[in-house]
């Protein structure tokens, strides 16, 4: 049976996450416009810096920082940010971002995840219209970026992944 295009792109994002270097959670993101992949991104340290998988430890884990908090202490650039950095804004206007995350300890997909507050801001400013997030092999959610604009969670202190 032929895979629908949403799962096709989510499958590609899931493959992209395999390049990730985080010891806690790896994410893969792809940006698609007019059924063409504009760019890809995965979780990893900035170019030229050591990755956590090379160092053998995660600073946030050592400090027992819970998921969704204190990202300024993380070595990695998030998958969404890396995908956005790699694409010109003119090609992202009206595009769709596909996002998949995997917990590196369990090997399971990260259910009910969402982009962190900083990545949401980048997605908004990039001009991306929709975000598809895979929850498990059979289910995904579609988020209208306009919802993130209208419901400014930075006013409510709600966290992302």
Label the model's feature ranges.
Residues 3-7, 39-161:
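Zn2+-dependent cytidine deaminase-like catalytic core
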């Amino acid at each position: 049976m032929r895979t629908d295009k949403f799962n096709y792109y989510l499958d590609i994002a899931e493959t992209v996450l395999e390049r990730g270097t985080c010891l806690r959670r790896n994410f893969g993101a792809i940006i698609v416009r007019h059924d063409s992949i504009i760019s890809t991104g995965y979780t990893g340290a900035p170019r030229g810096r050591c990755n956590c998988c090379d160092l053998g430890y995660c600073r946030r884990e050592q400090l027992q920082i819970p998921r969704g908090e204190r990202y300024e202490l993380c070595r990695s650039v998030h998958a969404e940010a890396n995908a956005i950095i790699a694409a010109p804004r003119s090609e992202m206007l009206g595009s769709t971002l596909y996002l998949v995350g995997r917990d590196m300890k369990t090997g399971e997909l990260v259910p009910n995840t969402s982009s962190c507050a900083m990545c949401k801001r980048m997605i908004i400013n990039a001009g991306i219209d929709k975000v598809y997030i895979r929850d498990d092999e059979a289910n995904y959610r579609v988020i209208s970026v306009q919802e993130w604009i209208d419901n400014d969670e930075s006013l409510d202190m709600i966290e992302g992944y």
